[in-house]
Design a protein with these regions (language model features):
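Extended, charge-rich alpha-helical regions
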Residues: 12-15, 23, 183-187, 191, ...
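N-terminal leader regions that mediate targeting or early regulatory function
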Residues: 1-229, 233, 247-255, 388, ...
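Amphipathic alpha-helical surface "interface" segments used
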Residues: 163-171, 238, 279-284, 469
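Acidic-enriched, low-complexity/disordered segments with a strong bias for Aspartate over Glutamate
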Residues: 3, 41-44, 60, 66, ...
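Nucleic-acid-interacting cores, centered on viral/eukaryotic replication and modification enzymes
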Residues: 108, 124, 128-153, 193, ...
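Short amphipathic alpha-helical leader/targeting segments
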Residues: 156-157, 161, 271, 302, ...
């Protein structure tokens, strides 16, 4: 029967030559395990627009990161301390405990690093195109560094009529703050309102909990303009979580990150003189850079935190700071030996070196999460839908890298796109990797051909950019703007 067909997420070649990265002298013959779709007659090359030779320094480039960096206000930390004893078990159950705890830490940003890495971003593939290969922020990174769940219902799902009553209560509070001295539901006004008002019954405690999660979502997870207020569009999500329903926050947050990186890349290419405001929280991108590029890490994180029992992975980067010159950063980003493919170690799902399916996956949230890490799909955000391409960065997830195939774009409703993400654990099969990942000879040859083919166009584009990159009427710039458009459902 058709409904019994298993979807296999991993392709296997029982005997193939695998290279250790781009070092052609380190080869081995073994079984190769690849994420699908891969190894087709017409592989999907990276976007040529992603390798435009953008100048190393752009003094006139105006980018504001302030809105995307919430810090961790003292009042917020007080609220976490107040509610954690009461709700920690519930947060653990729906998968947000690490995310809430991580929000109590301050993470400093290095704007030079963020701008430099954005220059390598490809909006077409949602990956960074480095000279040595592709890499990206994955769902695993959002789970490990952001503490956000990949499992649960879609963030666009509406609550039931019973739950809707709590949404209405939050709207009333928001209206009250609009009429107060604050004039709007600012973060400080919101938290003070609930810290000063002690709940006297279960309903009051429930509304405070929903208000708390609404602020957490607005500040740290699904931030949208205006950036200094609690957003009413997160009320539906917050109240559903209060009622014990898990929500898939990681794909929503990752979709927003991809969207804003694509917008920032277009801004950089055009050398736009107007100020560009980054709204999506970039904390996780900064942490991703520190995890993946050891030479760009703050030294204090290695020595000061050694041996400490930290509450979350992200906490090792709390309050540390570094400032590097743009040329130093670019050199590190372009070096194939400077990138750590698996900084978190091997997957924690167990069953290494074996195939899993059916009941094994149904019984394990870890296996269900891992399946979403490795499966090409769509990320449904609050206001955008983005492609997710783990098969292009398979080594980050422990798999060998072959030539990636095109993942088809489905122009459909968000519900249909969500069905691609929301897999049925009974109907999937995949392999849990147990060896150091490498690349195939075909991939190395294909990548070299891509790099060679782009060298000529890079030189030509560089000349165009030098002649007048700031002019939006320049025909070369027009071509690049077209190349970097993002498809959004």
């Amino acid at each position: 029967m058709a409904d019994e067909v298993q979807e296999v997420l991993v392709s296997v070649n029982p005997s193939i030559t695998i290279l250790s990265g781009h070092n052609e002298s380190k080869v081995s013959s073994r079984a190769g395990y690849f994420l699908v779709p891969c190894n087709v007659d017409s592989p999907d090359p990276p976007s040529a627009a992603a390798v435009i030779p953008i100048p190393a320094t752009q003094a006139d480039l105006q980018v504001n990161f302030d809105k995307s960096w919430s810090g961790s206000p003292k009042l917020w930390r007080r609220w976490v301390e107040k509610l954690r004893p009461r709700h920690e078990a519930a947060w653990q159950e729906i998968g947000i405990l690490d995310g809430v705890v991580t929000s109590t830490w301050r993470f400093n940003r290095d704007e030079n690093v963020l701008l430099e890495i954005a220059k390598f971003w490809s909006p077409r593939t949602n990956t960074f195109i480095f000279p040595w290969g592709e890499a990206t922020v994955t769902l695993e990174d959002l789970a490990v560094l952001g503490g956000l769940p990949v499992l649960g219902s879609c963030v666009r799902e509406k609550p039931t009529p019973v739950v809707q009553e709590d949404v209405n209560e939050l709207k009333i509070v928001r209206c009250n703050l609009n009429a107060s001295k604050y004039k709007k539901p600012t973060f400080s006004g919101w938290v003070k309102y609930f810290l000063e008002d002690i709940p006297t019954d279960s309903k009051g405690e429930r509304i405070e909990h929903a208000a708390f999660l609404s602020m957490w979502l607005s500040m740290f997870v699904l931030k949208e303009a205006p950036f200094d207020v609690v957003q009413p569009n997160v009320f539906d999500i917050a109240v559903q979580m209060v009622h014990g329903k898990g929500m898939a926050l990681a794909p929503a947050a990752l979709a927003s990150l991809y969207r804003d990186l694509s917008s920032l890349k277009r801004h950089i290419i055009c050398n736009n003189q107007e100020k560009f405001v980054v709204g999506t929280p970039l904390n996780v991108l900064q942490l991703w850079i520190w995890e993946r590029f050891p030479a760009l890490r703050p030294k204090r994180a290695v020595s000061f935190l050694e041996g400490r029992n930290l509450p979350t992975r992200a906490a090792r980067w709390g309050n540390v700071q570094t400032r590097l010159d743009s040329s130093d950063v670019r050199g590190e980003l372009e070096s194939p030996t400077r990138f750590e493919w698996m900084p978190y170690g091997s997957t924690n799902v167990g069953l290494h070196g074996s195939w899993v399916s059916g009941d094994d996956i149904v019984r394990s949230k870890e296996l269900q999460s891992f399946a979403r890490y490795i499966r090409a799909s769509y990320l449904i955000g609050m206001y955008c839908t983005e492609k997710y391409h783990p098969h292009r960065v398979a080594r980050q997830l422990g798999f060998d890298q072959d030539m990636p195939a095109t993942f088809p774009r489905i122009r459909s409703s968000w519900k249909e796109s969500w069905r691609r993400y929301d897999l049925n654990p009974q109907r999937i099969t995949f392999f849990v990797p147990d060896s150091q990942p490498g690349i195939t000879k075909d991939y190395m040859k294909w990548w070299k051909e891509f790099r060679c083919a782009t060298d000529t166009s890079k030189k030509r584009m560089a000349a165009v950019i030098q002649e007048g990159a700031s002019s939006s009427t320049d025909p070369g710039i027009k071509r690049q703007r077209q190349d970097t458009q993002v498809s959004v459902s």
